[in-house]
A protein has these predicted regions:
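Hydrophobic transmembrane alpha-helices that form the core helical bundles
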Residues: 67-70, 89-170, 310-331, 371-386
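C-terminal membrane-solvent junction of multi-pass transporters and transport-like membrane proteins
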Residues: 341-352, 387-441, 467-476
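TM-loop-TM module centered on a large, flexible mid-protein loop between adjacent transmembrane helices
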Residues: 106-116, 258-319, 338-375, 379
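Transmembrane alpha-helical segments of multi-pass small-molecule transport proteins
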Residues: 47, 81-82, 123, 148-175, ...
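Select transmembrane alpha-helical segments in multipass membrane proteins
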Residues: 41-52, 116-128, 161, 216-229, ...
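Membrane-interface loop-to-helix entry segments
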Residues: 142-145, 154-204, 216-217, 234, ...
Length: 476
């Protein structure tokens, strides 16, 4: 069977691609914020690992494999493994950066330290729209709950889920991390059950590379499948946000990052093997994973899988996304790019105002039935612009922090490090070009205007006496 890779196929999966990519007031015056002594050095390597894996494994593992089979046939599993490698290429320098520096505000702190004040301002305001990614999870978790229990209203279930994890995150990062560990363990059990029972029922030649259906649409189809998958493969980079909270940041953060890569390759590859190996390809192509799950699991196990698979995958993503969105923004508030009062903390150290903002950004599109795919489309180029700022910052490490770089426990030669930076640049350029092919002219115009606004903001705001860049990057 040859699977069609026509324009219609690409159109069918466009919405899925957009959703997966981001599964993501007042006068600006100086104000006094009550200082809360932050708890530091309490996250273990296992905590960081589960935060990263839980963030990365979202709805993509359930929704993307069917469309990928349309694009590349039996090799959909291999494309997912390749996408995990591509996803690492996008952030390849980060393990080495985090072995050298502790970052208090994630990418914002890195860009501000390496690229300068004005670029930090551009990044600060450009990051805010990306908090819309929480809404994509709210929509998805409601959809899956409704498919399992039709009597449940998908919209209100999504809002309820966002509300529960908003409350958990208000209890502090330590509580969020404990909940995340439980969610990820249960998620592994559910996906492991699917993989093991599915592999026992394989019928298709999933490992015959020369089979006609293995690369059904040739190299272009295989590459398209990688691009479809790739945004579900590097969410674990959020671990870098927790430099202050990690017990041994220089050792634990880079290792936790690296541990996530083989984990995702095994989980994603295993699920995709089962998805393409049990039923005929023409039955599963373009279909969600639940179709296969119903065929290999009895009703009781299917219910367990639906709760432990898609629902918990999205729950772990929601749980970590709230804090991940707040930490960089909080640092930009402390530096004066945004109102400093926004960085207020409760007694548990949670940035409650920013979490409320993130929560509202998550529930309002769900509540008002906004087209999230349209919103995501309109900020796609802005997100790409921020990614290129990150890459510029990567290249500055050996010069900006030469002594700390030499002492890094993961030190490599400058040539090898710059090679990793070039890999990241190459990976992002390919994704940027691939994304631009699907963008319409109005979206491009809106995105370019947004980029210009961010640049202008960084330039003019940088001269304000209220902007005082705090130290949020430490060498020891």
């Amino acid at each position: 069977m040859a699977l069609n890779n026509s324009h219609d196929v690409r159109k069918r999966i466009k919405y899925t691609i957009n959703i997966t990519i981001y599964m993501q007031g007042g006068a600006f015056m100086s104000s006094t914020v009550k200082e809360i002594k932050e708890k530091t050095g309490y996250l273990k390597r296992s905590d960081l690992y589960t935060i990263g894996v839980g963030q990365a494994i979202g709805s993509g593992v359930l929704t993307l494999i069917g469309p990928a089979i349309l694009l590349t046939g039996q090799s959909a599993w291999l494309a997912y493994v390749a996408a995990c490698i591509w996803g690492f290429m996008m952030i390849a320098p980060i393990p080495w950066i985090t072995s050298t520096l502790k970052l208090g505000g994630g990418f914002y702190s890195l860009v501000g330290d390496m690229a300068g004040k004005r670029v930090a301002g551009m990044y600060a305001v450009g990051f805010l729209p990306q908090t819309i990614n929480l809404a994509t999870y709210g929509v998805a978790i409601g959809m899956y709950a409704n498919s399992l229990w039709p009597q449940i209203n998908a919209k209100w279930f999504g809002i309820a889920a966002l509300s529960v994890f908003f409350a958990i995150n208000l209890c502090g990062v330590d509580v969020m991390a404990k909940v995340q560990k439980i969610l990820v363990i249960l998620l592994f059990v559910a996906l492991g059950l699917f993989i093991v029972l599915g592999c026992l029922q394989l019928k298709n030649p999933v490992f015959e590379f020369t089979a006609p259906d293995f690369f059904s649409n040739g190299p272009s189809g295989f590459f398209s499948a990688i691009m479809l998958y790739v945004y579900s493969t590097n969410g674990y980079s959020c671990i870098m946000n927790y430099g202050k909270q990690a017990k041994e940041a220089h050792k634990d953060i880079p290792k936790a990052l690296l541990y996530c890569i083989p984990t995702l390759m095994v989980v994603y590859g295993g699920v995709a093997i089962v998805a393409s190996g049990v039923l005929p390809l023409d039955q599963v192509a373009g279909q969600p994973l639940t179709l296969v799950a119903k065929n290999i699991l009895n009703p009781a196990l299917f219910t367990v899988f639906m709760i432990g698979g898609p629902v918990l995958a999205l729950s772990s993503s929601i749980n970590s996304t709230i804090s991940n969105n707040c930490i960089p923004v909080a640092q930009s508030c402390k530096d004066g790019w945004l109102p400093k009062s926004w960085a207020a903390q409760n007694r548990r150290g949670a940035y409650w105002k920013l979490m409320t903002f993130t929560y509202l950004m998550g529930i309002l599109p769900v509540l008002l039935d906004f087209s999230i795919s349209d919103v995501v489309n309109n900020i796609m180029l802005l997100a790409s612009a921020l990614a290129f700022l990150q890459i510029y910052a990567y290249f500055q490490l050996p010069k900006k922090h030469a002594e700390a770089w030499e002492k890094s426990p993961m030190h490599i030669s400058n040539g090898k490090y710059y090679f990793l930076c070039c890999l990241s640049l190459f990976a992002y350029i390919c994704i940027f070009i691939n994304s631009c092919r699907s963008l319409k002219l109005p979206v491009v115009i809106i995105s370019l205007i947004a980029i210009v606004v961010c640049m202008a903001y960084g330039w003019f705001r940088s001269v304000s006496p209220d902007v005082k860049m705090e130290t949020s990057v430490w060498e020891d």
